Regions:
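Terminal, compositionally biased non-globular sequences in eukaryotic proteins
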Residues: 1-255
Length: 255
């Protein structure tokens, strides 16, 4: 019977199972995710070579001018040394994982989850998937509020493959796209996009993309040759007048 159980376990029947239990489901960027991984033995003992936790996010990739959905592994950790789980034994292994500053906020179509995988020799590896609610840092929230107070309306939020000039820093970026509702800005701008490159409690580094509205022949030619988009890299600190600093940066591209 023992040999038969081992054969069944090798194809996933009566094998060990895994369930990751998070201490909470909602986290802020840069916070530490904590919890336990619960492994329950199946009908026979099995050797658990490794337990991996991998942080994933979905994102949009552009291939041949078509947008396709994909997923990116943002971080992975191993939480154990090899051990044997006995039949019907229950074992809990605690873990902690830092959320990197590049993890997207879970708004719009953006999703973030932890995938738990067991590496079991000569067997189908069981797995588990737990979704997270990710909130921006306090300072990032203040930046987004300041942009809206300047007269911009948040139109959409997308997580996309990082452009080539940022791929040495991150695989993906989350773009907050704003449409102007302010009459002063509307004369000069079509839209505004903001990407958070780094976030901490005391500062945020952002990339602002300003899409200028075409004005006259010169503006038409700029737009025709994709020269109408300007980039601003800006670091904002917790003691800054955020709204004034953003306004100065945006208006510098309107002149």
């Amino acid at each position: 019977m023992s040999l038969f159980n081992k054969v069944l376990a090798s194809v996933g029947v009566g094998a060990a199972t895994v369930d990751t239990k998070l201490h909470k489901s909602s986290y802020t960027i840069n916070e530490m995710v904590t919890g336990v991984v619960e492994i329950v033995g199946g009908n026979t003992e099995q050797q658990i070579d490794a337990i991996y936790l991998t942080l994933y996010s979905n994102f949009i990739r552009e291939i041949d001018d078509k947008k396709v959905n994909d997923q990116a592994a943002l971080q992975s950790i191993k939480i154990n040394e090899p051990f044997t789980i006995q039949a019907n034994e229950k074992r809990e292994i605690p873990f902690s994982m830092d959320l990197p500053s590049i993890v997207p906020v879970t708004t719009g179509h953006s999703r973030v989850w932890i995938h738990t995988g067991l590496d079991i020799k000569n067997a189908i590896d069981p797995s588990d998937k737990d979704f997270l609610d990710i909130q921006p840092t306090r300072l990032a929230s203040a930046v987004l509020s300041a942009v809206q107070n300047l007269g911009f309306r948040l139109r959409k939020v997308d997580t996309e493959q990082a452009p080539s000039y940022l791929r040495n820093r991150t695989k993906i970026v989350q773009e907050f796209e704003f449409q102007t509702t302010n009459n002063t800005y509307r004369r000069y701008l079509d839209e505004l996009e903001i990407v958070f490159l780094e976030q901490s409690e005391r500062s945020v580094e952002i990339l602002i993309q300003v899409d200028r509205r075409a004005r006259g022949l010169g503006g038409f030619l700029s737009e025709a040759f994709n020269m109408d988009e300007s980039f601003i890299r800006l670091t904002i600190f917790e003691n800054d007048n955020i709204q004034a600093k953003l306004a100065d940066a945006i208006e510098s591209k309107m002149r």
